[in-house]
A protein has these predicted regions:
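Alpha-helical transmembrane segments and their immediate juxtamembrane cytosolic regions
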Residues: 1-252
Length: 252
Protein backbone atom coordinates (compact mmCIF):
# COMPACT_ATOMS: atom_id res chain seq x y z
CA UNK A 1 0.00 0.00 0.00
CA UNK A 2 1.10 3.58 0.51
CA UNK A 3 4.80 4.16 -0.11
CA UNK A 4 6.94 5.13 2.85
CA UNK A 5 9.17 7.59 1.04
CA UNK A 6 12.75 8.52 1.71
CA UNK A 7 14.97 11.32 0.43
CA UNK A 8 17.74 8.93 -0.58
CA UNK A 9 18.18 7.34 -3.98
CA UNK A 10 15.29 4.94 -4.41
CA UNK A 11 15.24 1.27 -5.19
CA UNK A 12 13.44 1.26 -8.51
CA UNK A 13 12.39 -2.42 -8.64
CA UNK A 14 9.98 -2.21 -5.66
CA UNK A 15 8.50 0.93 -7.25
CA UNK A 16 7.98 -0.97 -10.51
CA UNK A 17 6.37 -3.91 -8.72
CA UNK A 18 4.14 -1.53 -6.79
CA UNK A 19 3.18 0.28 -9.99
CA UNK A 20 2.29 -3.02 -11.65
CA UNK A 21 0.08 -3.95 -8.70
CA UNK A 22 -1.57 -0.53 -8.91
CA UNK A 23 -2.42 -0.98 -12.59
CA UNK A 24 -3.94 -4.35 -11.76
CA UNK A 25 -5.93 -2.74 -8.95
CA UNK A 26 -7.31 -0.11 -11.33
CA UNK A 27 -8.39 -2.80 -13.80
CA UNK A 28 -9.88 -5.00 -11.07
CA UNK A 29 -11.90 -2.18 -9.50
CA UNK A 30 -13.05 -0.91 -12.90
CA UNK A 31 -14.44 -4.35 -13.68
CA UNK A 32 -16.02 -4.61 -10.21
CA UNK A 33 -17.84 -1.30 -10.65
CA UNK A 34 -18.89 -2.15 -14.21
CA UNK A 35 -20.36 -5.52 -13.23
CA UNK A 36 -21.56 -5.12 -9.63
CA UNK A 37 -22.33 -1.41 -9.36
CA UNK A 38 -23.64 -0.62 -12.84
CA UNK A 39 -25.08 -4.07 -13.46
CA UNK A 40 -23.42 -5.06 -16.72
CA UNK A 41 -22.71 -8.67 -17.57
CA UNK A 42 -19.25 -10.08 -18.03
CA UNK A 43 -18.33 -13.43 -19.52
CA UNK A 44 -15.18 -13.73 -17.42
CA UNK A 45 -15.27 -11.39 -14.42
CA UNK A 46 -16.80 -13.01 -11.35
CA UNK A 47 -15.35 -12.19 -7.93
CA UNK A 48 -16.19 -15.70 -6.72
CA UNK A 49 -14.31 -17.40 -9.56
CA UNK A 50 -10.88 -18.85 -8.68
CA UNK A 51 -9.10 -16.75 -11.30
CA UNK A 52 -10.51 -13.47 -10.00
CA UNK A 53 -9.76 -14.49 -6.43
CA UNK A 54 -6.12 -15.13 -7.33
CA UNK A 55 -6.00 -11.79 -9.15
CA UNK A 56 -7.42 -9.94 -6.14
CA UNK A 57 -5.08 -11.72 -3.74
CA UNK A 58 -2.04 -10.92 -5.89
CA UNK A 59 -2.94 -7.22 -5.73
CA UNK A 60 -3.43 -7.01 -1.97
CA UNK A 61 -0.50 -9.30 -1.14
CA UNK A 62 1.78 -7.15 -3.30
CA UNK A 63 0.71 -3.90 -1.64
CA UNK A 64 1.01 -5.19 1.91
CA UNK A 65 4.30 -7.04 1.38
CA UNK A 66 5.88 -4.04 -0.37
CA UNK A 67 4.61 -1.70 2.35
CA UNK A 68 6.40 -3.82 4.91
CA UNK A 69 9.51 -3.84 2.73
CA UNK A 70 9.42 -0.03 2.67
CA UNK A 71 9.15 0.33 6.45
CA UNK A 72 12.88 0.05 7.29
CA UNK A 73 13.67 2.53 4.49
CA UNK A 74 11.51 5.30 5.94
CA UNK A 75 13.04 8.09 8.02
CA UNK A 76 9.73 8.99 9.71
CA UNK A 77 7.52 5.90 9.62
CA UNK A 78 5.29 7.07 12.48
CA UNK A 79 4.48 10.28 10.60
CA UNK A 80 3.75 8.26 7.46
CA UNK A 81 1.49 5.95 9.44
CA UNK A 82 -0.48 8.88 10.85
CA UNK A 83 -0.91 10.36 7.37
CA UNK A 84 -2.26 7.05 6.08
CA UNK A 85 -4.53 6.78 9.14
CA UNK A 86 -5.96 10.20 8.32
CA UNK A 87 -6.63 9.14 4.73
CA UNK A 88 -8.28 5.95 6.00
CA UNK A 89 -10.55 8.00 8.28
CA UNK A 90 -11.56 10.19 5.33
CA UNK A 91 -12.31 7.08 3.27
CA UNK A 92 -14.52 5.65 6.02
CA UNK A 93 -16.40 8.94 6.42
CA UNK A 94 -17.02 9.41 2.70
CA UNK A 95 -18.14 5.84 2.04
CA UNK A 96 -20.32 5.66 5.17
CA UNK A 97 -22.08 8.93 4.34
CA UNK A 98 -22.39 8.76 0.56
CA UNK A 99 -22.24 5.01 -0.13
CA UNK A 100 -23.46 3.28 3.05
CA UNK A 101 -23.93 -0.05 1.29
CA UNK A 102 -20.26 0.10 0.28
CA UNK A 103 -18.89 1.56 3.54
CA UNK A 104 -15.28 0.71 4.35
CA UNK A 105 -14.70 0.29 8.08
CA UNK A 106 -11.29 -1.36 8.10
CA UNK A 107 -9.82 -1.68 4.64
CA UNK A 108 -6.31 -1.90 3.31
CA UNK A 109 -5.52 1.72 4.20
CA UNK A 110 -6.60 1.16 7.80
CA UNK A 111 -4.51 -2.00 7.90
CA UNK A 112 -1.48 -0.24 6.48
CA UNK A 113 -1.71 2.56 9.04
CA UNK A 114 -2.18 0.12 11.92
CA UNK A 115 0.67 -2.11 10.72
CA UNK A 116 3.06 0.83 10.40
CA UNK A 117 2.23 2.26 13.83
CA UNK A 118 2.30 -1.15 15.51
CA UNK A 119 5.62 -1.96 13.88
CA UNK A 120 7.03 1.34 15.15
CA UNK A 121 6.37 0.04 18.66
CA UNK A 122 7.81 -3.45 18.22
CA UNK A 123 10.55 -2.75 15.66
CA UNK A 124 13.40 -3.00 18.20
CA UNK A 125 12.17 -6.51 19.02
CA UNK A 126 11.85 -7.46 15.34
CA UNK A 127 15.40 -6.28 14.72
CA UNK A 128 16.71 -8.74 17.29
CA UNK A 129 15.39 -11.69 15.28
CA UNK A 130 17.51 -13.21 12.51
CA UNK A 131 16.00 -12.06 9.23
CA UNK A 132 15.51 -15.55 7.82
CA UNK A 133 13.88 -16.86 10.99
CA UNK A 134 11.67 -13.77 11.26
CA UNK A 135 10.54 -14.13 7.65
CA UNK A 136 9.75 -17.82 8.10
CA UNK A 137 7.88 -17.24 11.38
CA UNK A 138 5.87 -14.35 9.93
CA UNK A 139 4.94 -16.40 6.86
CA UNK A 140 3.88 -19.33 9.05
CA UNK A 141 1.75 -17.10 11.29
CA UNK A 142 0.16 -15.45 8.26
CA UNK A 143 -0.77 -18.86 6.86
CA UNK A 144 -2.04 -20.09 10.23
CA UNK A 145 -4.29 -17.07 10.87
CA UNK A 146 -5.29 -16.46 7.25
CA UNK A 147 -8.91 -17.45 7.85
CA UNK A 148 -9.22 -16.13 11.41
CA UNK A 149 -11.85 -13.55 10.35
CA UNK A 150 -13.92 -16.46 8.97
CA UNK A 151 -13.88 -18.33 12.28
CA UNK A 152 -11.09 -20.85 11.96
CA UNK A 153 -7.33 -21.28 11.76
CA UNK A 154 -5.91 -22.33 8.43
CA UNK A 155 -5.05 -21.08 4.97
CA UNK A 156 -7.69 -20.55 2.27
CA UNK A 157 -9.75 -23.78 2.11
CA UNK A 158 -7.45 -25.68 4.46
CA UNK A 159 -9.12 -25.61 7.87
CA UNK A 160 -6.95 -26.61 10.81
CA UNK A 161 -9.45 -25.95 13.61
CA UNK A 162 -12.36 -23.72 14.53
CA UNK A 163 -11.87 -20.69 16.76
CA UNK A 164 -14.23 -20.39 19.77
CA UNK A 165 -17.26 -18.42 18.62
CA UNK A 166 -17.36 -16.43 21.84
CA UNK A 167 -14.28 -14.49 20.74
CA UNK A 168 -16.26 -13.00 17.87
CA UNK A 169 -19.08 -11.63 20.00
CA UNK A 170 -16.85 -8.69 20.91
CA UNK A 171 -16.93 -7.67 17.22
CA UNK A 172 -13.28 -6.61 17.34
CA UNK A 173 -13.35 -6.42 13.54
CA UNK A 174 -10.19 -4.31 13.47
CA UNK A 175 -8.24 -7.15 15.10
CA UNK A 176 -9.70 -9.92 12.94
CA UNK A 177 -12.56 -11.07 15.17
CA UNK A 178 -15.67 -9.68 13.44
CA UNK A 179 -19.20 -10.57 14.41
CA UNK A 180 -20.30 -11.51 10.90
CA UNK A 181 -23.96 -11.33 11.92
CA UNK A 182 -23.68 -7.55 12.19
CA UNK A 183 -20.40 -6.46 10.59
CA UNK A 184 -19.79 -5.78 6.91
CA UNK A 185 -17.11 -3.77 5.15
CA UNK A 186 -16.70 -3.32 1.40
CA UNK A 187 -12.94 -3.60 1.86
CA UNK A 188 -11.74 -5.62 4.84
CA UNK A 189 -8.15 -6.23 5.92
CA UNK A 190 -7.94 -6.71 9.71
CA UNK A 191 -4.68 -6.63 11.65
CA UNK A 192 -4.74 -10.42 11.93
CA UNK A 193 -3.64 -12.07 9.70
CA UNK A 194 -2.33 -9.24 7.51
CA UNK A 195 0.21 -7.70 9.89
CA UNK A 196 2.21 -10.92 9.54
CA UNK A 197 2.44 -10.42 5.76
CA UNK A 198 3.55 -6.84 6.44
CA UNK A 199 6.26 -8.20 8.74
CA UNK A 200 7.32 -10.61 6.00
CA UNK A 201 8.15 -7.50 4.01
CA UNK A 202 10.00 -5.95 6.96
CA UNK A 203 12.25 -9.01 7.27
CA UNK A 204 12.59 -9.35 3.50
CA UNK A 205 14.12 -5.86 3.39
CA UNK A 206 17.08 -7.23 5.37
CA UNK A 207 17.60 -10.09 2.92
CA UNK A 208 16.88 -8.51 -0.46
CA UNK A 209 18.69 -5.38 -1.59
CA UNK A 210 17.61 -4.27 -5.07
CA UNK A 211 19.86 -1.79 -6.80
CA UNK A 212 19.30 1.93 -6.45
CA UNK A 213 19.39 4.57 -9.15
CA UNK A 214 17.52 5.30 -12.35
CA UNK A 215 15.20 2.58 -13.66
CA UNK A 216 15.30 1.40 -17.27
CA UNK A 217 13.53 3.87 -19.55
CA UNK A 218 10.72 1.43 -20.34
CA UNK A 219 9.89 1.06 -16.63
CA UNK A 220 9.99 4.73 -15.65
CA UNK A 221 6.22 5.30 -16.09
CA UNK A 222 5.52 2.22 -13.97
CA UNK A 223 7.95 3.40 -11.30
CA UNK A 224 6.37 6.86 -11.31
CA UNK A 225 2.99 5.30 -10.57
CA UNK A 226 4.53 3.16 -7.84
CA UNK A 227 6.07 6.21 -6.16
CA UNK A 228 2.64 7.82 -5.74
CA UNK A 229 0.62 4.91 -4.43
CA UNK A 230 -1.34 6.77 -1.77
CA UNK A 231 -2.43 9.53 -4.16
CA UNK A 232 -3.48 7.04 -6.82
CA UNK A 233 -5.33 4.93 -4.27
CA UNK A 234 -7.30 7.87 -2.87
CA UNK A 235 -8.32 9.13 -6.31
CA UNK A 236 -8.84 5.96 -8.29
CA UNK A 237 -12.36 5.02 -7.23
CA UNK A 238 -13.95 8.48 -7.78
CA UNK A 239 -12.24 8.73 -11.18
CA UNK A 240 -13.19 5.19 -12.22
CA UNK A 241 -16.76 5.58 -10.95
CA UNK A 242 -17.17 8.91 -12.73
CA UNK A 243 -15.81 7.60 -16.01
CA UNK A 244 -18.00 4.49 -15.88
CA UNK A 245 -21.04 6.57 -14.93
CA UNK A 246 -20.55 8.70 -18.04
CA UNK A 247 -20.08 5.59 -20.16
CA UNK A 248 -23.12 3.90 -18.59
CA UNK A 249 -25.55 6.84 -18.71
CA UNK A 250 -24.39 8.86 -21.69
CA UNK A 251 -22.81 6.36 -24.02
CA UNK A 252 -24.35 3.10 -22.85
Amino acid sequence: MPVLRTKTSRMWLPDALRGLALLNMLAYHAMYDWVYVFGHESSWYNIWAPGCHVWQQYICWSFILLSGFSFPLAKRPAKNGLIVAGCAAVLTFVTAVFMPSEAIWFGVLHLNAAAVLLTCLVYPLLQRLPAGAGLAASAALFALTNQLPEGYLGFENWRLCAVPTGLYKTNWFWLGLPDLTQFASADYFPILPWVFLFWCGVFLARLWHPGRGEPPAALRPLCAIGRNTLLVYMLHQPVIYGALWVWHTVLG
